[in-house]
Amino acid sequence: MAILMSAEVPGQTQEGYQATVDALREGIMKAPGFIMHMTAPSEDGWAVFEVWESKKEANDWFAHNVAPALPEGVTPRRTFRELYNVITA
């Protein structure tokens, strides 16, 4: 079953997030196992939510693409949940 990756990014701004996602958008759309990506402001920065086919695919994408693109000092707090159900339009 699919997984939900949640990342809290303390200190991240909308502008900082936008620069990162602009650089990664094309790649994530083609990433094995990627289903969807959403974001929202959080109390102390920015929150990112992604749905992936597996935790391994999410971790591989993060390690090879996201981590190297993050500004120095920005360290997301990532958590994973196995999803019971995903319904799309």
Where do the model's predicted regions map?
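Short S/T/G/P-rich N-terminal loop/turn motif that feeds into the first structured element of a domain
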Residues: 1-49, 53-68, 74-89
